C-alpha cells in the first residue's frame, strides 16, 4: 500500500503534464487560427482606416488598375455633409493622394477647385484639412498653376484667423509653391501677421513662416517691406542658442538673405528710412546686439547652425558687390564694430 500511493502520485503528475501540454497546444492552435483569419479578412474598399488605404496602393500596384477611392471621396464632397465628415473626407483624400499618386494625377482641375472651395467653410478643421489636401496635390506638377490661383485666399486665412494649426497647414502649402508676382501686394499686407507668427510659441509655425519670409526676402520689390516690418523688442531672442536647431537654422538663413539684399548695389543706391521698431533696426541698427548672438552660435552643438552663423557674419562684414575684392571689405557699422 505504501508503494502504491507514490506511484499513483507520479502517474497523476504525468497526467497533469500531458493535460497542460494539450491545453497549451490547443491555445496556440486557436491563436494561429485567429491570426490567420485576421490576415485573410479584407475590410471593404470604403473603409477609412490607414491600413485599408495602404492596401489600396498595394492592390493597384499589383493589378495595374485604379482603386476608384479618390474619385469616390471627391464625389462625396459634393454631398451635404456635416463639418466633421467633410474634415475626415478631406483627410482621407490627402492620404490617398500621397499613396496613389498615379491615380491622383488623373484628377481634374475642377477637382482642385472643389477641394479649394472647402477653404470657405466656417469650421477651421475643414479649412485645415483642405489646405493639407491642396498641399498633397501640389506635389503633382500639373496642378501647381491651378493651386497658385488660390494663394491669395490662403494668405487671407493666415492673416485673419489666429489658429496655429491652420498657419502651419497654410504656410506649408505656400512654401511648396512658386508664388507668382501678382500675389506680392497681398504678401505686403500679410507681413505683419507673418512676423507675429515668427514670434509666437509654435515651433512648426515659426519655422514655416521664417522659411516663407526668407524666400520673399530674395524678391527685390519686397525686401524693404520686410525690413521695415515692425517687430517686438525681444526679436533677437530667436537667435538664442536655447532655441531648437531647426528654427535657428531657418532664422539664420533669413538673416543672411536680408543682409545680402540690403548690401546689394541697387538697394544701397536708394536712401531708405526705417521705423525705430523695424526688423532692420533689430538686426542691423546701431543698437543691435545681433553680433553677440551670432558669435555665441558659432560654437552651437549643431554643425549646420555653426556654418550658417558664420555665413551671416561674413555677409555682414563684406557687402555683396565687394565680396570679390577682399581688400575692400570693411566691417558693417551696425554689427561687429571696430574696437569691439
From Swiss-Prot:
Q: Which InterPro entries match?
A: ARM-like, ARM-rpt_dom, ARM-type_fold, Armc12
How does this protein lie in the membrane? Peripheral membrane protein
Q: Where in the cell is it found?
A: Nucleus; Mitochondrion outer membrane
Phenotype on deletion? Answer: Knockout male mice are infertile due to asthenozoospermia and abnormal sperm morphology. Mutant animals show no significant abnormalities in the gross appearance of the testis or epididymis compared with controls, but have multiple sperm mid-piece defects such as absent mitochondrial sheath, and scattered or forked axoneme.
> Which domain of life does this protein belong to?
Eukaryota
UniProt biased composition (Low complexity): 324-340
Instruction: Kindly state the tissue distribution recorded for this protein.
Output: Testis-specific.
Subunit structure and binding partners: Interacts with TBC1D15, TBC1D21, GK2 and IMMT. Interacts with VDAC2 and VDAC3 in a TBC1D21-dependent manner. Interacts (via ARM domains) with RBBP4.
What is the protein's given name?
Armadillo repeat-containing protein 12
The organism of origin for this protein: Mus musculus
